[in-house]
Amino acid sequence: MDLLGYVKKQTGEFLENMPKSIRKKKGQFFTSVETAIFMANMFDISNCKDEVSVLDPGAGTGILTIAFVDRLFAEKSNTSVKITCYETDADVLPVLQKNLAYLKNAFNDRVSYRIIEEDYILSQSNDFQENLLAAKNPEKYDYVIGNPPYLRITRDNPAAIAMPKVVHGAPNLYFLFASMSLFNLKDNAEMVYIIPRSWTSGAYFKAFREYFLNVGKIEGIHLFVSRDKVFSAEQVLQETMIIRMKKTAEKPESVLITSTNSSSDFEDVSELRVPYDAVVSGEELYVYLPTNEADINVIKKINMYHSTMPDEGLKMKTGIVVDFRQWEELRKEPGENTLPLFYSQHIRDGRVNHQPSGKEYDWIIDEKPGLIQKNKNYVFIKRFTAKEERRRLQCGVYSPSDFEEYEYIGTQNKINFVDKTDGGEMDAQTTYGIYALLNSTLFDMY
């Protein structure tokens, strides 16, 4: 049996005997052979040395490492490899040991390996923090390949405490692993990781992005068009990407972005070469994922704007009322001391009305100041739109003159609204200007 066929068989038998519910609690989602081969082929091995070191954190059954070594030896006949795998799961360790032994037997002296049965994060926390207990010369690697655990943890979890410089908001093991792997690389060395897309934007991941994109630079990204077909055997509904990072401060001119429909059709790959500044942009270091030239042009045009809403004294806020929590303050019909409560269903054709929304409660009493807001100029935006809808960004102008009998109104938290940061009121020109921007095709595509 060929090398990868053997590993696939061993992995399949393990998955059959280990319930998915147990693996999910551990954050384990196993990589297919097809994905492992694709990831192995993403590395640049043109300047490969005679002896290289490979790290696989959270190795599982070892399929990623073995796919990489299989490719390496097929192209570099004189290279030998030293493998380091981290794995703590007692259930999968026997499979990993068997697979690495099979690899060693296939290539004899060209392969040496060790399995470290320690926590990947905690065992290196002093080194990562560079404190007094850190090793003088922590081990570094030529290549890192990984499919890290996807598991939300609390901020007081030991792993989160061990890596404070990358934690802000709600931590997840996957980006702690990615940060540590970048730390583990030699200068100018590469890592290939399969991770969720969630880190590419948002405040929770800002600290991670600052570390990840300053210590390293993106060389390549692979996207899956269909999110339910990445870990198809695992039935995971998670938007996922594969990323190739180089540990360097030098920014490349461009990033190669490839895409396929799923993890089983790597024969049909679309390629796009994108300027680096169109991928990583702004003070927040958001990562944009264009898949065609039109997407690139949209990003370039948006980046031409010289100011943001906060720069102009404006802020996007979320509707105040969480209806299922504040139902005691809600009313089905207007009455004494009631105010109109606005839902996303009230945003229609660029305006905001208060026709029946289809919700049970369209009114709120005015007894709690924290649940109501001034009746003044706003732009309302739907927070969520159905996938089949033509426009992702749907908004409407809220005009206080349409509801002039009320001093205050209520907004349900499925809408966002644009307001002045200082609590004042936008003039009509600003209100309609913001609406025109948000309602444009450019912003909708963005």
Where are these regions (language model features)?
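Short, conserved SAM-binding/catalytic segment
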Residues: 96-110
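Conserved acidic residues
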Residues: 52, 142, 378
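S-adenosyl-L-methionine
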Residues: 1-48
